[in-house]
């Protein structure tokens, strides 16, 4: 039994050592400063709410207020001239839309304020779109290795957070 425990410990340790960063320091610095990155959402963290907690606790191995989005296409694409957000929303809305296609945080903005502040080992990037219907603010906390958390503040909804990673945008193929 002890040898089995040691074997599992070694396997976990080797796996942890082989865990690779999403991007290296130079790439992360370059894409943040160039205002050209994609935030890929891996988990969603809605605000605590009794009704939502009751639903989430029904899932096996559920961790309160943490929704796994791995494998989804939820992201925020940032370039110098646009911000495109496609993210889900799982919290309380104070002014809901009657349009069923208008759920989540989905917008395209060409007029926005972008600020990136370098801290010791991370960046704080704030994006405020000016041409979207709801007044929103996106705050990214980005590590040197490309891991990021995103907090979305909206006047019509409870705040919501996401964890994920940054990547460089893939170049579109020209036909």
Feature map (PLM): residue ranges:
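N-terminal secretory signal peptides
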Residues: 24-86
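Short, solvent-exposed secondary-structure boundary motifs
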Residues: 59-69, 101-108, 126-133
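Short, cysteine-centered beta-strand-loop-beta hairpins and adjacent loop/turn segments enriched
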Residues: 47-50, 90-94, 132
């Amino acid at each position: 039994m002890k040898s089995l425990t040691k074997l599992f410990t070694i396997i976990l340790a080797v796996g942890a050592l082989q865990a690779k960063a999403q991007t290296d320091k130079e790439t992360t610095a370059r894409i943040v400063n160039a205002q050209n990155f994609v935030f890929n959402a891996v988990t969603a963290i809605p605000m605590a709410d009794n009704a939502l907690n009751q639903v989430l606790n029904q899932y096996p191995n559920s961790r309160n207020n943490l929704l796994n989005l791995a494998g989804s296409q939820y992201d925020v694409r940032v370039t110098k001239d646009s911000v495109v957000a496609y993210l889900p929303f799982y919290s309380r809305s104070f002014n809901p839309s009657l349009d069923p296609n208008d759920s989540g945080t989905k917008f395209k903005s060409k007029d926005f304020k972008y600020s990136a502040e370098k801290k010791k080992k991370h960046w704080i990037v704030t994006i405020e779109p000016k041409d979207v219907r709801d007044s929103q603010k996106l705050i990214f906390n980005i590590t040197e290795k490309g891991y990021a958390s995103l907090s979305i503040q909206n006047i019509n909804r409870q705040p919501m957070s996401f964890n994920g990673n940054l990547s460089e945008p893939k170049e579109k193929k020209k036909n």
